[in-house]
């Protein structure tokens, strides 16, 4: 997995670790960030404590040789690759005139190119796996202007991830490799979102990382040959798997969860009985 030293990526890793999973964490954070918690080494410690085996790897997903070497090392240590989780991303929710080109390039190199590269490096190993999955942390592929008109640089990078899902699902369907995307209905309470978007107060109107971890777990356990090319929303995935208690994922039940993420189309409404309004 890429970008798993904290937040959603780490939560997904810990969920899998409780089943004894072997997890390679490919991320840049070898030393503590001045604003954000966690490194690949602290993440590895948490994974091992949860019951998994961890391989922390310092990787810049913009660097081809580092990505290929990391995938090869993971395959050699664990005997193959069953799942590729493209979680690494860069975010800047700015308009066109406010986005400098350095930030634009960073988002597209990490989010878009990094997803393509990491998937490409994993595919030869995934072809040999029993139930191979690639999961991209991207929104549904919807290019209507109402979505693109907000934060064009960031949104377009995330939509390239979605295009990788759609295109590779078709390209590698015959190989039995599943390519799917997963996206949250609401804001998710992570240190990165607190720092870059909402602040501490804004986190109270979010769901916890557990909802994304639980949804990813459901996807990974589906038959790869039957479930591919899907754009999944966290609460829909869980509802369809039988979950009915979504209030447990709220950071603060007394706060509304907002109107939902701007990149989720109207064709993917809330599951029956699920509300974003405060519950008490």
Residues of each region from the PLM?
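C-terminal helical subdomain
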Residues: 181-182, 200-280
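Active-site loop of short-chain dehydrogenase/reductase
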Residues: 51-53, 80-81, 113, 126-140, ...
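Canonical Rossmann dinucleotide-binding motif of NAD(H)/NADP(H)-dependent dehydrogenases/reductases
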Residues: 1-26
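Amphipathic alpha-helical dimer-interface segment in Rossmann-like NAD(P)H-dependent oxidoreductases
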Residues: 72, 76, 93, 101, ...
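Catalytic Tyr-X3-Lys loop
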Residues: 82, 90, 97-117, 135, ...
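Conserved mid-core segment of classical short-chain dehydrogenase/reductases
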Residues: 37-39, 68, 76, 90-105, ...
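Active-site-adjacent segment of SDR/Rossmann-fold oxidoreductases
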Residues: 19, 166-177, 223-225
